[in-house]
Amino acid sequence: MEHIYVGRKNGEKTQGGVYHYLYNEETQKLSLLGLEDVLQGFTYIALTYNRTRLAATGQDSEGHDLLVGYQLDTPDKRLKRCGQVRVGTAGDICHLSDNRAGTLLLVTDFVDKAVHFYEFLPNGAPGAFLARVPFEGKSTGYRQGSSHPHSAYFSPDDRYALVADLGANTVWVLRCQPADNRFDLVGSWRAPDGYGPRHIAFHPNGKYVYVLMEITGHIAVLELHSNGQLTLIELIFAVSPAYETVEGSLNAADILVDMKGERLYASYRSVQEIDVFGIDRRTGKLSPLGYAPTRGMVRGLHWGRSGVLCALGEELP
């Protein structure tokens, strides 16, 4: 059995908050267990790497952005709200991640043109604000008139944080020194104009970085060097021939590498498909393997505990 936590916004028939589901791998059925916590203005949710804590973002009754922390280490995997803090973002949080050590939370705000670092306490509560790192830049495509960070991720060794800035058309590299409250910009890679970096996936070896371009659908394969510099290995286009008929943005959404570093998955909302690539472990390069229809707009891709289940966050058209 796989426990799945889904954040939902307020709707005509749904209450905003974190919902708890149970997935039966044998029957392939997903059952709703209930609403775990009411969270108005929900925006993003993230499960820690050790799967004992969860963080989510929403808003309080006065409209301020909130960062909320939970524990889920009980036998029934129910959530316990452990604390919350107001965050100084601009009301458009679009991504949330934690480091492998479980000591930091990284909040990305599309409108704020910045990422925010917070402590993540062992009891599941968000801790002190550490730093806000702003960015500048622009490009030629839609929503690229200024910096608009779309997501940010810690490298597998926790030394760096990589930011996919759709607006500035750039991947930024920050060196993380939380003991000194320092998160310095040490590297960057700029995509071809109009591509729009959206989400990032790391190979388990920490050497190869895969960047999904929301607008064009390309995937950039980059090498992350020990000094924080990025170099391009290759740019590869999507698999499905259906993409050739799309006018405008492909609306690529999420990208994921499997736990063994052998396969890469990328979701494309415009054609409602997931593309699958093989990974050459020696070079990091990709080879197309196929694609699958999703019958809906897949916004998020996540691995289950077993490494077999791929949970899809579906966005209805």
What are these regions (language model features)?
Residues 4, 54, 105, 161, ...:
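Hydrophobic beta-strand positions that form the internal "hydrophobic ladder"
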Residues 9-11, 59-61, 110, 120, ...:
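Short loop/turn segments immediately following the C-termini of beta-strands
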Residues 14, 39-49, 88-100, 136-157, ...:
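Beta-rich, blade/repeat-based domains predominating
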Residues 21-28, 70-78, 118-127, 174-182, ...:
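Short loop/turn segments immediately following beta-strands, especially the blade-tip
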Residues 31-37, 80-87, 131, 137-143, ...:
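A short beta-strand motif characteristic of beta-propeller blades
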Residues 32-102:
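Blade-loop segments of beta-propeller domains
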Residues 78-151:
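Asp-box/WD-like beta-propeller blade repeats and closely related beta-sheet repeat scaffolds
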Residues 158-217:
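Loop-centered beta-sheet repeat module
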